[in-house]
Amino acid sequence: MTTQPRKILVTCALPYANGAIHLGHMLEHIQADIWVRFQRMRGNKIHFVCADDAHGTPIMLNADKLGITPEELIAKAKADHIRDFAGFNISFDNYHSTHSEENKQLTAEIYNKLKANGFIKSKVISQLFDPEKNMFLPDRFVKGTCPKCKAEDQYGDNCEVCASTYSPMDLINPRSAVSGTTPIVKESEHFFFDLPAFEGMLKEWTRSGSLQSEIANKMQEWFESDLQQWDISRDAPYFGFEIPGAKDKFFYVWLDAPIGYMASFKNLCNREGIDFNEFWAEGSDAELYHFIGKDIVYFHSLFWPAMLEGSGYRKPTNVFAHGYVTVDGAKMSKSRGTFIQASTYLNHIDPECLRYYYAAKLNDRIEDLDFNLEDFVQRVNTDIVNKLVNLASRNAGFIAKRFEGKLADKLEDKSLFAEFTAQAEQIAAYYESREYNKTIREIMALTDKANKYIDEKAPWVIAKEEGKEAELQAVCSMGIELFRVLMSYLKPVLPKLAERAETFLQAELRWDNIHQPLLGHTLAPFKALFSRLEKKQIDAVVEETKALFAAANKAAEKTEAKPTALSAVEPIAETITIDDFAKLDMRVAKVLKCEAVPESNKLLRFELDLGDHTRQVFSGIKAAYNKPEELEGRFVIMVANLAPRKMKFGVSEGMILSAGTGGSDLFLLSADSGVTAGMQVK
């Protein structure tokens, strides 16, 4: 531990003010909160801020649909988000909104500096325009077929199947996600940030060790494909900040969103007298860390540091990215009851259970985390209830009844105590590097040793023997001491359990007093510290989630306005001739092997038998089949004469046919019994 406290500012990605907080959000906020709480225990000067991302077309459209103003919508969202984060014991020093005076001023200041320094350009561009809604369509409000891999139902800016990025103008068969109509092309003047001007700086920053290796490697790919000018403006109607000196032009949400980190901190500084420039000025010696999801790495590792550099502010010390949350091996699903909102979870389960489970599986890499519901129950009960809390309860009773709550005046096993406290720096190193899984593994190994000590000493046997009161007190006091050390290590993960432990121990759990035993100390009466997690609680969460989804669907069916036609039955495609159809060679194929592609959220990899040879095919149906191995041995229908397509994860040699609207609503087509691999579909 350094003698001078570190100065640290930590942020989480800003949740969008157009929806509820769910367990995917909570992964990041729990990860960051654990790190922040650890730094506080180490005596560092740390500030932890966040805000709602409160601008953009989706908010404008949703408010209109609900018959309220965007301001009313984001105010309710902010209140809900603050409630949910507090419910999970996320210890923000400030939670603000990008729709704030601080953010408006900082956004204008940064834009004007970039413009004055020659980094803002303007040009007339062609855009997709919804003639029915009389509005230009943002990238995410256009859907169509990917121009690269031909995957259908993809957004206007990137493909979730092949991970390509492109312009909405490049989409095949585009349609408005607002009205369902075919958009037209219109011209408009837009403002662009000159990102290529910062390529040299960004390459140097990438090599500085400021980024996770996965991010640094990804940035090299982006450099190789050439950086592009970044469109930072949007046309009215739009909910956001108007660009200074440009009528009916607004800042794109992704320009003012990261500035929201600064604005939230500025709001905290104004309230508590903190020096804003000490953390944000160019040359600042404070540390700045952003915790984000892997889906927004592009913005945080390219645009954001370039904006800061171009406007005279410091760059982040590091950007920590994490993966997505899956549930029972599949993408979170509303219909299956696994797209769990934070509020739904809190209605039934202690938030510390999720904090512990996430910590036990989190590491410093960009990997998806699977929230396995059965394993969740087992791990919480085994580790926290049966091992950790039981260590305290099995010793506290003897101390209370036989010794009036007073601990022994000396340690029964000094070497064991030294072994436990000697792990403090290793555990601290794991916390520092965000390798929480190693932290938990180390702590639980010590917990097992503590319980083994009690099992071997058997205080319940000693208690029955006359003249062994001192030995009984010493053994049980040792058990309580080991519990205190373990709870000190776990305090960043389980803050509320730590509070209850502090009440029982009548002592504060601090990192700097881990080595100081509570000799001759008096305990408070022991009360239950933690409750078992029951399967029925999980079932209640799943059922409530399903009910919320069903109610939302019912409400959507009743509304007259249909903001999207994407969920309706797709219209019949353009008529083709029999000759066109004859070009397709569809075959029955037997699934020899099926497995998930770990790096993709959508893809399964199939090895197919076509009778006289085998093929590899990638299919974007991962969300619909969370146990891909169960598809092995099944017969499917595939287009066999489709040209092989080179994808990020290998070559796909055909297309497997399925029906549905996408996501988890996809169903493989199959054939009646009696077919054999390679049969042609007539």
From Swiss-Prot:
Pfam families registered for this protein in UniProt: Anticodon_3, tRNA-synt_1g, tRNA_bind
Main location, first listed in the record: cytoplasm
Catalytic reaction annotation: tRNA(Met) + L-methionine + ATP = L-methionyl-tRNA(Met) + AMP + diphosphate
Molecular function terms, GO-annotated: ATP binding; metal ion binding; methionine-tRNA ligase activity; tRNA binding
Manner of cofactor binding, per the entry note: Binds 1 zinc ion per subunit.
Subunit structure: Homodimer.
Name of the protein this chain belongs to: Methionine--tRNA ligase
Source species: Haemophilus influenzae (strain ATCC 51907 / DSM 11121 / KW20 / Rd)
